Regions:
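Short beta-strand element of the alpha/beta-hydrolase
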Residues: 25-35
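Catalytic histidine-centered segment of alpha/beta-hydrolase-like enzymes
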Residues: 231-242
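N-terminal cap/lid segment of alpha/beta-hydrolase-fold proteins
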Residues: 1-25
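Conserved alpha/beta-hydrolase
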Residues: 49-68
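Short beta-strand/loop motif that positions the catalytic acidic residue
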Residues: 193-194, 199-202, 206
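Conserved alpha/beta-hydrolase "acid-adjacent" motif
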Residues: 207-213
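Hydrolase active-site cap/lid region
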Residues: 121-173
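Alpha/beta-hydrolase active-site loop
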Residues: 71-101
C-alpha cells in the first residue's frame, strides 16, 4: 500500500490523504467518512480511489482518534465541511512540510453507517457534487435498539469510553444529542435533500441499521437505493470496489 500523507485542518482535524496516481484535466476529490465505533482502516480504499485519479482525504472526526476536540460537540458532517473549506488553500503534509497545490473542481463524499449520515448531510452543501452512503444511519430513532445490539451496558457512552479509551472523547451529554431527533440526523432534513446527489447501498439483513428505515428514507426523498437481499452490515470498501463502475457513472 502507498504511504499516506497526514495533514491537519482547522488546527484540530487530522486527516490522511493521497494525491491521485495520475493527473487528469479536473482535480477531483473524494472525502471518506468513517463509521463509529470503528478503527481507522480505510487506507486500502484510499489507495484504490487514488489509482482511479482522485485526491483522497480520510479525516478523523473532532474528538475521535488523532483529531483534537470532543466527539459530537458539533455535528460530524460539519467537520467534513471544514475540510472542504480548507482544500483550496493547498495542503501541507505534517512529516516534512511538503506542500500540495489543490483547487478542487469536483468534490465527492463517501460514508458508511455512522459516516453515511455525514455523507448525506454533506450533500446539502452546494460544493459537494455527489455522495455515496453505504448502509447509512438516516434516522437516529434506531439508536436505542442499536445500542442494545452492541453492549449490555445501559450507558452506551460509558461503554465507548471503556472499550475505546481516548479513541473517542465522548461525554454522556454529547451522546444524548443523537436521541433528540435533529442533531446529525438526515431524517430531519428530508425536505432539503437533492435526490440526484445521493446514491445509497443497503442489505435487507443488516443487523445494525434496519433496512426498513433506509427504504423509508429513499421513498420519502427519491434517493436511489441499491438493495441486496443478503450481506449484513456491508463493508464500504467492498461496495466501492465491487460497484465502482456504477459509482463512477453516478459521479459523472
Amino acid at each position: 500500500m502507498s504511504w499516506a500523507f497526514r495533514t491537519r485542518f482547522k488546527k484540530e482535524i487530522v486527516a490522511e490523504f493521497l494525491p491521485p496516481a495520475r493527473l487528469g484535466k479536473k482535480q477531483k476529490v473524494i472525502i471518506l467518512c468513517d463509521g463509529m465505533p470503528s478503527i481507522p482502516r480505510k487506507q486500502p480504499l484510499m489507495e484504490f480511489l487514488a489509482r482511479k485519479g482522485y485526491w483522497v482525504f480520510y479525516p478523523r472526526y473532532r474528538g475521535a482518534w488523532e483529531s483534537g476536540g470532543k466527539f459530537l460537540e458539533r455535528s460530524p458532517h460539519k467537520d467534513i465541511l471544514d475540510v472542504i473549506d480548507e482544500l483550496p488553500k493547498g495542503i501541507r503534509e505534517l512529516a516534512f512540510g511538503k506542500r500540495f497545490a489543490l483547487k478542487p473542481d469536483e468534490i465527492f463524499v463517501i460514508g458508511g453507517s455512522f459516516g453515511g449520515a455525514a455523507a448525506i448531510l454533506a450533500s446539502l452543501d452546494n460544493r459537494v457534487k455527489k455522495v455515496i452512503a453505504n448502509c447509512p444511519v438516516v434516522d437516529w430513532k434506531i439508536l436505542a435498539a442499536e445500542e442494545r445490539l452492541e453492549t449490555s451496558n445501559p450507558n452506551y457512552a460509558a461503554y465507548i469510553r471503556a472499550a475505546f479509551g481516548n479513541g473517542y472523547r465522548l461525554s454522556d451529554r454529547n451522546w444524548r444529542k443523537l436521541h433528540g431527533g435533529r442533531f446529525y440526523n438526515p431524517a430531519a432534513h428530508v425536505s432539503e435533500i437533492d435526490s440526484a446527489k445521493i446514491m445509497m447501498f443497503h442489505a435487507q439483513d443488516d443487523p445494525y441499521v434496519p433496512y426498513k428505515s433506509v427504504k423509508n428514507f429513499a421513498d420519502r426523498t427519491g434517493v436511489k437505493l441499491n438493495s441486496f437481499a443478503r450481506g449484513g452490515h456491508l463493508s464500504t470498501e467492498m461496495i466501492v470496489q465491487k460497484y465502482w463502475k456504477r459509482i463512477k457513472k453516478f459521479f459523472g
